[in-house]
């Protein structure tokens, strides 16, 4: 059994016409397309609602959408399975999610990770070929898209449920792949907590844990009996939001999984962004991409590096997070500019920092703080 797994596959203004016309060669090139035609299963992350309506939800972040006609490119890919379990699947609310499901079903495209409630969304996908049963478990971090008992959406990662789900799936299948939509965007290493989560999935029996959210190639860890890949980059996702990040978003990995009598094997195929889509990397490009990838993977073997590097990464983001507590009014922006972006430091002191840490870190305060914010946002 051979499987290819790609990451974010999203039509945008740059290549929408190619998607609508089903011009798959323009999007991924003839060589890569021919490869996809030789495999038993092709898996990609559909990170956009397919809908012709405009019904955006209230959220923090962009509300994505793509016309239903863009399905014409997806249906050109043989043996296709789309995970829709991500932070953008509910950007257009229930109408957008329902439209996505309807369009995929009309074109006989298999999908998973979403549903009309959490019980439907948490169902895995099981693929069988030549007597081998492969289970695909999908979950996403919480960013306005998750289903619950009374709301449609994506299957949320839940420390009290997700590991048990994988353990149960392992008992039904020969191998299990976990598609975890999470991890910090544009960070090429695991956070300490993400590493713990992914390792726990392996300990529960998963053969491969693949993190899809970072928009960049991350690193690999071969842990116990399984493999963890902390970010594979985009597949086809062209947006101006990435313009200043070309050094890390222009390359990605197609993950190849081979299952035979000798076992479960994971390898990486480097890809390079084109003006309209993606292509196979040249031998020279592939060597450079994999050298950097292997270097980062080697660094991940050092537990102290994971902790210290993440501390440095946090220092570059903390002011952005704290600014949200001050608000987004024009007067705050003006004063922040006049103080050379030091307003947060001027207004918040040691006690405030400790208070915020306690509210976020302590389970009781965290739950109450979060529920209070949700109550405000629903008014």
What function would you assign to each model-found segment?
Residues 5-7, 42-47, 77-87, 111-115, ...:
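Active-site neighborhood of phospho(di)ester-bond hydrolases with catalytic His/Asp-centered motifs
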Residues 53-75, 175-205:
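Active-site-proximal segments of metal-dependent phosphoesterases and phosphodiesterases across multiple
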Residues 246-247, 251-379:
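A short C-terminal boundary segment appended to hydrolase-like catalytic domains
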Residues 11-14, 50-53, 87-101, 118-123, ...:
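Active-site environment of divalent metal-dependent phosphoester hydrolases
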Residues 78-81, 192-253:
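Conserved beta-sheet core of the metallophosphoesterase superfamily
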Residues 14-30, 64, 128-176, 196, ...:
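Binuclear metal-dependent hydrolase catalytic cores centered on His/Asp/Glu-rich metal-binding motifs
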Residues 39-51, 87, 167-189:
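Short acidic, glycine-rich surface-loop motifs adjacent to enzyme active sites
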Residues 5, 11, 15, 25-81, ...:
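Catalytic alpha-helical scaffold of carbohydrate-active enzymes acting on polysaccharides/glycoconjugates
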């Amino acid at each position: 059994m051979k499987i290819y797994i790609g990451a974010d596959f999203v039509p945008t203004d740059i290549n929408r016409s190619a998607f609508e016309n089903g011009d798959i060669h323009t999007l991924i090139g003839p060589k890569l397309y021919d490869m996809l035609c030789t495999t038993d299963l092709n898996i990609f992350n559909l990170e956009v609602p397919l809908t012709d309506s405009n019904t955006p939800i209230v959220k923090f972040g962009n509300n994505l959408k793509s016309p239903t006609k863009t399905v014409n490119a997806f249906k050109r890919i043989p043996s296709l399975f789309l995970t829709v379990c991500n932070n953008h699947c509910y950007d257009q609310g229930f109408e957008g999610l329902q439209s996505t499901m309807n369009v995929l079903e009309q074109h006989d495209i298999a999908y998973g990770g979403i549903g009309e409630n959490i019980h439907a969304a948490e169902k895995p996908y099981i693929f069988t070929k030549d007597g081998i049963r492969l289970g695909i478990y999908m979950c996403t971090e919480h960013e306005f898209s998750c289903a619950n008992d009374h709301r449609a959406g994506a299957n949320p990662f839940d420390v009290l449920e997700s590991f048990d789900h994988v353990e149960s799936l392992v008992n039904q299948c020969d191998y299990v792949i976990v598609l975890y939509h999470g991890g910090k965007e544009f960070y090429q290493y695991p956070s300490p907590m993400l590493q713990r989560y992914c390792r726990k999935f392996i300990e529960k029996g998963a053969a491969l844990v693949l993190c899809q959210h970072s928009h960049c190639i991350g690193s690999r860890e071969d842990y116990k009996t399984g493999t963890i890949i902390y970010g594979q980059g985009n597949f086809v996702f062209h947006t101006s939001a990435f313009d200043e990040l070309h050094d890390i978003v222009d390359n990605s990995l197609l993950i190849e999984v081979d299952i035979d009598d000798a076992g479960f094997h994971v390898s990486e195929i480097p890809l390079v962004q084109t003006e309209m889509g993606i292509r196979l990397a040249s031998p020279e490009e592939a060597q450079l991409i994999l050298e950097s990838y292997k270097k980062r993977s080697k660094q991940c073997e050092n537990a102290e590096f994971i902790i210290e590097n993440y501390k440095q990464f946090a220092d570059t983001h903390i002011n952005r997070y704290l600014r949200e507590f001050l608000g987004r009014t024009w007067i705050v922006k003006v004063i922040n500019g006049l103080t050379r972006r030091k307003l947060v430091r001027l207004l918040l002191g040691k006690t405030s920092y400790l208070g915020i840490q306690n509210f976020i870190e302590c389970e009781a305060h965290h739950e109450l703080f979060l529920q209070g914010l949700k109550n405000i946002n629903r008014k």
